[in-house]
Amino acid sequence: MDSSAKTASAPDPFFAGTLAEADPEIAAAITGELGRQRHEIELIASENIVSRAVLEAQGSVMTNKYAEGYPGARYYGGCEWVDVAETLAIERAKKLFGARFANVQPNSGSQMNQAVFLALLQPGDTFMGLDLAAGGHLTHGAPVNMSGKWFKVAHYTVRRDDHLIDMDEVARRAEEVKPKLIIAGGSAYSRPWDFKRFREIADSVGAYLMVDMAHFAGLVAGGVHASPVPHAHVTTTTTHKSLRGPRGGLILCNDEALAKKFNSAIFPGLQGGPLMHVIAAKAVALGEALRPDFKIYAKNVVENARALAESLRGHGFDIVSGGTDNHLMLVDLRPKGLKGNVSEKALVRAGLTCNKNGIPFDPEKPFVTSGLRLGTPATTTRGFGVSEFKQVGGLIAEVLTAIAQAEDGKAPLVEAAVKEKVKALTDRFPIYQ
């Protein structure tokens, strides 16, 4: 046999080689991250653990395909199979949330919100959103964000006494500034949103109502949180967080004329070719959320959050607004004499992953903070229940109480002991075996 025949029959390492063979450094980083996820308790409210099916779809050959446009109207040939995937994602999103129209192409939560601005606002227009310091989001008008640079922003906030949104104040503010858009939703607000009242306020001043349900979309899908879709002109959400899918965005609405504006804003307004492998993974996750067991998951997320909040309160910690009705909570560390940055680092050393977070009217800078944000979606996914989250509350209290008594904010013996307890817990609930 000649050499050319041998070459033709030999596997091409470009297609057959493993990641470990092709790039051992990245392979090692991925292996390390898998180990971290397996052996730490994930309490970051915006994170979750996707199914192996979602991982498989996102790592599929659909990453190779360019598909500018929308199903049935592409600027490239060969899109018949990615059209199938995107159509499935669209139809599943519509069914899951009871919306007439859905755009599954946004690459991120920031881009989905930017698309709404592009479709509905002109530079210099006024909109309202919850202040970041009160639990809002960067894309809702923070001065450092595009939304705060290109538009006039009139923030509303929470009351000092109970840290709840004062809807009468929202109405007064709207009447004062006459916004073109009002945003409901945030990244660190643990209580219900009055979508009906927000829509009434928006209608009273001729504004659009946008609800960013990125954090609680999975709870809406699971039927344990009120849906904004019947009330909002447009609803946006990420597909990760409590929805438990790949990282990306989603736009929902019930008005055909607005849907066309949002489609044009995404493509060609903001994006070119969509990430078809991610859209395929979105379809998988949306399909999972349509199954009966997802309702059980969503119910457990909320029950676990309440159990964690009550456990922490039982150990003498203050919870902003007194508790939670969704998947997250803010811990006010000031009564313990602690800062968020120091507390986050100590908990991470103990295997309890969380993030420092500002609390309403926080006197500290954003990289210091007086609080911690804790969430239950990821650890609920791996099987933790109420009893485990009560234990987690005790472990958090153990670490924070120890560092509060230490001059340097470190308690290595306690942190190491808690880390062993964390490992024992996570070993009972393995992932990706």
UniProtKB/Swiss-Prot annotation:
Pfam families: SHMT
UniProt keyword Aminoacyl-tRNA synthetase present: no
Keyword Cell division among record annotations: no
GO-annotated biological processes: glycine biosynthetic process from serine; tetrahydrofolate interconversion
Domain of life: Bacteria
Alphabetized SUPFAM superfamilies for the sequence: PLP-dependent transferases (SSF53383)
Cofactor: pyridoxal 5'-phosphate
Catalytic activity entry: (6R)-5,10-methylene-5,6,7,8-tetrahydrofolate + glycine + H2O = (6S)-5,6,7,8-tetrahydrofolate + L-serine
Function: Catalyzes the reversible interconversion of serine and glycine with tetrahydrofolate (THF) serving as the one-carbon carrier. This reaction serves as the major source of one-carbon groups required for the biosynthesis of purines, thymidylate, methionine, and other important biomolecules. Also exhibits THF-independent aldolase activity toward beta-hydroxyamino acids, producing glycine and aldehydes, via a retro-aldol mechanism.
HAMAP family: SHMT (MF_00051)
Entry-linked NCBIfam families: PRK00011.1
Entry similarity comment: Belongs to the SHMT family.
Name of this chain's protein: Serine hydroxymethyltransferase
Species annotation: Nitrobacter winogradskyi (strain ATCC 25391 / DSM 10237 / CIP 104748 / NCIMB 11846 / Nb-255)
Gene label: glyA
